[in-house]
Amino acid sequence: PIVERRASQMTEGDLLGLPDTAETSINGRKATTWNAPDWLVTACEQPVLLFLDEVDRATQEVRQGLFELTDSRKINGWHLHAETLIVAAVNGGENGAQYQVGEMDPAELDRWTVFDVEPSTEDWLKWANGQIPSIVWDFINHNRKHLEHEGDFEPNKVYPSRRSWKRYCDTAESVGVFGEDGDRDMLFNLATA
């Protein structure tokens, strides 16, 4: 199974768990015990692919916890299953410097095998064939510069992207724009909005 967590949306509680309200004592002294989050229990009890997305957008506290998890394969007393694999993603690439991300220091990067993945327009068209309506696929195929913005990004301005084309297709399909009786003017207006 795949266990996915978006590090940018995690808090320390999402990473470590929350304290148990039951009173616990160890050798006669009060102690706090923790209820581990479900994803961590799963990754510790069975082999999974643990996918951590947007690690470079996580808070520093969460990143430090992920650092321990990836370095020692344990956190807060929980040990990952021996066959659990960890894969993480960051926002990089040619435009990575224009995203609001935290820079990863050499000690963090040293814990990973790093692959730079830059999908081409051909890669996207291959994926999109059959995933999006043919009219949009044909448009992108014949107007490839419209797939994704090139150049610098201005703040608060929306640009075309692979994700936005997929969302556009999903939205237009949900209102029947692509059917035989579809409103082609609406199709154009949605695409240029």
Residue ranges and their predicted role:
Residues P1-H142:
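AAA+ P-loop NTPase catalytic core and its hallmark functional loops
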Residues W127-T192:
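Conserved AAA+ ATPase small/helical "lid" subdomain
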Residues T113-T121, R184-A193:
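Hydrophobic transmembrane alpha-helix bundles
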